[in-house]
Regions:
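A ligand-binding cleft/hinge motif common to bilobed small-molecule-binding domains
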Residues: 88-91, 225-242
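Early extracytoplasmic/lumenal segment of secretory-pathway proteins
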Residues: 27-92, 216
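Conserved C-terminal helix/tail region of periplasmic/extracytoplasmic solute-binding proteins
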Residues: 318-347
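Short, low-complexity disordered leader/linker segments with a strong preference
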Residues: 1-32, 347
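Mature extracytoplasmic/periplasmic domains
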Residues: 262-322
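Extracytoplasmic ligand-binding site segments that recognize negatively charged/polar headgroups
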Residues: 78-222
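Periplasmic-binding protein-like
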Residues: 134, 196-201, 239-263
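Short, hydrophobic alpha-helical packing/hinge segments within bilobed ligand-binding/sensory domains
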Residues: 68-69, 89, 214-217, 232-233, ...
């Protein structure tokens, strides 16, 4: 979720990675094909995993849950591990896209915070193990837009030309719904229409609809305010210490990104070894420090080598979290509505 990245891989390279390049066969090789959000892992850990296990990791990125889902549905790719967010895990379970996990091969599951076990999107963690969790908030430059405490700042004409907005319907509608006092998981037609009207009014004051570019534009100062992930805010601060972050008073989206194994994966045991590795305490702590997102491992917070201010962003108070909601998988009728209004909004 995650940090900005642009990935360009030629068709020939994809075929080499996932279909094998020509030449004499040397027999089965230990490989693992991972599909994850951009810049959402410490690449040194991939090398460490390869050294410890002898399993070669082929690694590719996507920008959003919807992009990942679309690529998988189109077929023609052969990934083993994917890392969708909570609501997308539920959708993929419903559509029989995931393999059940053998928790005997994932002993680090015992270190997962009990609050993150047995989630509504995957009871008993039959198909998924939490990878990282976090919150969506507003990142802004107070010198340009003042202090921000509400989602209303993203709809304020005073900030015209400086505002960025998520370029996907679920996140954008979720923000509008929260600002209006509704659940981001509502299926009520009147509430959805109200949020759509708000987004239509906002369109004229936006600098643009973007995803990964939010990171680049806010960090560089090209834009002054936009919604993004708490973990990325900590990274932005390294190059732009004037930025601030807030979880709006109306509440926000709390998300869990989870490691899953795709249905029919050719390297299931390798995938389970990878999942177990990534959730071990030392590895998860190093990964969390690098990407800025919150580990589900209960031992990690105490060993993080980060400032208390950084930890406060990564671990919001119970009071703040009580106002946050996780996205749930919506009925197909509502998903169709989202698709239709997004086409209208972007046209």
């Amino acid at each position: 979720m995650k940090k900005a990245i642009t990935v360009v891989v030629s068709a020939a390279l994809i075929l080499c990675l996932f279909a094998g390049c020509g030449g004499k066969s040397e027999g089965p090789k230990k490989v693992l094909n991972v599909y994850n959000w951009g810049e959402y892992i410490d690449k040194d850990l991939l090398e460490q995993f390869e050294e410890e296990t002898g399993i070669k990791v082929n690694y590719k990125n996507y920008e959003s849950n919807e992009q990942m889902y679309s690529v998988l549905k189109q077929g023609g790719v052969s990934y083993d591990v994917v890392i969708p967010s909570d609501y997308m895990v539920a959708r993929m379970i419903d559509e029989d896209m995931l393999e059940p996990l053998n928790l005997d091969n994932i002993p680090s599951y015992s270190l997962i915070n009990d609050k993150l076990k047995n989630p509504v999107y995957d009871p008993e963690n039959k198909y998924s193990i939490p990878y990282m969790w976090g919150t969506v908030g507003i990142i802004y430059d107070p010198a340009k837009v003042g202090e921000v405490t509400s989602w209303g700042a993203l709809f304020d004409k005073a900030n015209a030309g400086q505002i960025l907005m998520f370029d996907n319907s679920r996140d954008a509608m979720g923000i509008a719904l929260k600002y209006l006092g509704h659940s981001p998981n509502t299926t009520d037609e009147a509430e959805l229409n109200e949020a759509f009207e708000l987004l239509k009014q906002q369109k004229s004051i936006l600098q643009g609809y973007v995803m990964d570019q939010i990171f680049e534009k806010l960090e560089s100062g090209e834009a002054a305010i936009g919604p993004y992930y708490a973990g990325d805010y900590l990274t932005m601060l390294e190059n732009n210490p004037s930025l601030k972050f807030c979880i709006p008073e109306e509440g926000s989206n709390i998300f869990v990104d989870a490691m899953c194994i795709l249905k029919g994966a050719q390297n299931k045991e390798n995938a389970e070894a990878f999942i177990n590795f990534m959730n071990s305490t030392e590895v998860s702590a190093k990964n969390s420090e690098f990407i800025g997102y919150t580990s589900p491992n209960v031992e990690v917070r105490d060993v993080l080598e980060l400032s208390e201010d950084a930890k406060a962003v990564m671990y919001p108070s119970d009071e703040v979290l009580s106002k946050c909601e996780a996205f749930t998988n919506l009925p197909q009728k509502t998903l169709d509505y989202y698709d239709s209004i997004w086409i209208k909004l972007k046209s």
